């Protein structure tokens, strides 16, 4: 998540001078020097397991939402959920592997660009998620108040809101991009935050305001809007006849509220560690390395928990997953045998096509001219023939209309026809 620690020292007690020099360093990019081989194995393994499960879950959610966009006009809430899933997918695809690689090595060998952009990119995705929670909570409240109103929002408005979220999220952690760099210290290549003296006051203010702007205020506003939306759903469900939309609104509100609460709880240890290392006093205790490492694992686990919540709590996502699976199966290439003609001697039509009455008659005539053995074999499949006199009767009736058909008062002649027959 940002800095692994602000003032950290190696566990090696044999070199006190080295510890004193390391205590003044600001590590960045997930780089956390440690002499423990267990931590270098456990933390990367946990990160990769979380990464694999989360990538599969987010791919399912993204596929369901994109399949829905392809079939119909995207809704505001679905577009915002898609934005959440894209942020989670980006975190797991780009940031988690970098953290795993940084933890597994005692030196930084991932290059200058990754060192400079790692913390910035991680915070961009987290800020985008926090801002998206605020917007989706506001959309849930609007949908609970008037479900029909949400359908009238133009697609350009939705994409403009999403673009604005990512622009703001990119600007908030920009100081981390400016001051993160690689340095060689005590013969070891490290990823550090090198703050010049003229910018120390600015970075001190940044350390106080950034968690407030990215974590506290957005989730507080989102919680208020979610609670109002939930209360609105309970009120309107007792007064409206359109219970289907209200039940859907309540389900979406509960699902997204659960996602916001889980995200806040899993982010909390990381922000505690972040504030601890930024505001520790000179000579004060530093957070344990294990706490810092596990807090970052929990932060990435948030991106795995979100798609699981969507797929478990939403009936709409369950149905969408089934529909997406059926769509993927039915899009297989057509079998070439379906377009080929039926072979000779097997004239019982292609699969799925019923033969016409004329075809049935032709088959019957052909069978009649065949050998007796063939007739015996096909006796169970022969259709009853049309009698010649019946066929001639209907043919003459269709070809030559009778006078009775043109008689405007046929009931006057019914008695005469009966007498003539007698």
UniProtKB/Swiss-Prot annotation:
Q: Which residues are glycosylated?
A: 14, 19
Q: What is this protein called?
A: G-protein coupled receptor 151 protein
**InterPro entries in the cross-refs:** GPCR_Rhodpsn, GPCR_Rhodpsn_7TM
Q: How does it sit in the membrane?
A: Multi-pass membrane protein
Q: Does the keyword Membrane apply?
A: yes
What is its subcellular localisation?
Answer: Cell membrane
Q: Could you tell me the keywords of this UniProt record?
A: Cell membrane, Disulfide bond, G-protein coupled receptor, Glycoprotein, Membrane, Receptor, Transducer, Transmembrane, Transmembrane helix
Which PROSITE patterns would you find in this protein's record? G_PROTEIN_RECEP_F1_2
Tissue expression summary: High expression in the brain and lower levels in kidney and liver. In the nervous system expressed specifically in the habenular area (at protein level).
State the SUPFAM superfamilies in the record: Family A G protein-coupled receptor-like
Q: Which domain of life is it from?
A: Eukaryota
Task: Please list the GO biological process terms of this entry.
Answer: G protein-coupled receptor signaling pathway; regulation of synaptic vesicle exocytosis; response to acidic pH
Q: Which residues lie on this side of the membrane: Extracellular?
A: 1-45, 98-123, 179-205, 281-290
Q: Name one GO cellular component term.
A: synaptic vesicle membrane
Pfam families, sorted: 7tm_1
Which residues are connected by disulfide bridges in this protein? 115-191
Gene name of this polypeptide: Gpr151
Q: List all topological domains (Cytoplasmic).
A: 67-76, 145-157, 227-259, 312-422
Record-linked CDD domains? 7tmA_GPR151
């Amino acid at each position: 998540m940002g800095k692994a620690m602000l003032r950290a020292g190696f566990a090696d007690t044999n070199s006190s001078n080295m510890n004193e020099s390391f205590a003044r360093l600001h590590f960045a990019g997930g780089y956390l020097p440690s002499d423990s081989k267990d931590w270098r194995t456990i933390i990367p393994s946990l990160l990769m397991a979380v990464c694999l499960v989360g990538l599969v879950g987010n791919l399912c959610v993204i596929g369901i939402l994109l399949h829905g966009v392809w079939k119909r006009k995207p809704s505001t809430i679905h577009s915002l959920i898609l934005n959440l899933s894209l942020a989670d997918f980006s975190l797991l695809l780009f940031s988690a592997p970098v953290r795993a690689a940084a933890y597994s090595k005692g030196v930084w060998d991932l290059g200058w660009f990754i060192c400079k952009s790692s913390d910035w990119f991680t915070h961009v995705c987290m800020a985008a998620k926090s801002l998206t929670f605020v917007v989706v909570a506001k959309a849930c409240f609007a949908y609970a108040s008037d479900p029909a109103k949400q359908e009238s929002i133009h697609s350009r408005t939705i994409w403009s809101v999403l673009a604005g979220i990512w622009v703001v999220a990119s600007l908030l952690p920009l100081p981390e991009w400016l001051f993160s760099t690689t340095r060689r210290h005590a013969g070891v290549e490290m990823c550090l935050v090198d703050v010049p003296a003229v910018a120390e006051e600015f970075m001190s203010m940044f350390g106080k305001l950034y968690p407030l702007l990215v974590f506290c205020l957005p989730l507080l506003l989102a919680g208020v809007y979610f609670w109002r939306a939930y209360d609105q759903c309970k009120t309107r469900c007792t007064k409206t006849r359109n219970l289907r939309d209200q039940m859907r609104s309540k389900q979406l509100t509960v699902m997204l509220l659960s996602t916001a609460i889980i995200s806040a709880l899993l982010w909390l240890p990381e922000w505690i560690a972040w504030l601890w290392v930024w505001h520790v006093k000179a000579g004060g205790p530093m957070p344990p390395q294990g706490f810092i490492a596990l807090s970052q694992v929990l932060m990435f686990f948030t991106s795995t928990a979100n798609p699981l919540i969507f797929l478990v709590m939403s009936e709409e996502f369950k149905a969408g997953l089934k529909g997406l699976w059926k769509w993927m199966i039915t899009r297989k290439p057509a079998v070439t045998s379906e377009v080929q003609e039926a072979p000779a001697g097997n004239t019982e039509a292609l699969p799925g096509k019923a033969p016409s009455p004329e075809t049935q008659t032709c088959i019957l005539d052909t069978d009649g001219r065949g050998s007796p053995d063939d007739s015996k074999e096909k006796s169970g499949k022969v259709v009853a023939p049309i009698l010649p006199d019946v066929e001639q009767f209907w043919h003459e009736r269709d070809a030559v209309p009778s006078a009775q058909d043109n008689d405007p008062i046929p009931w006057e002649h019914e008695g005469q026809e009966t007498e003539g027959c007698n």
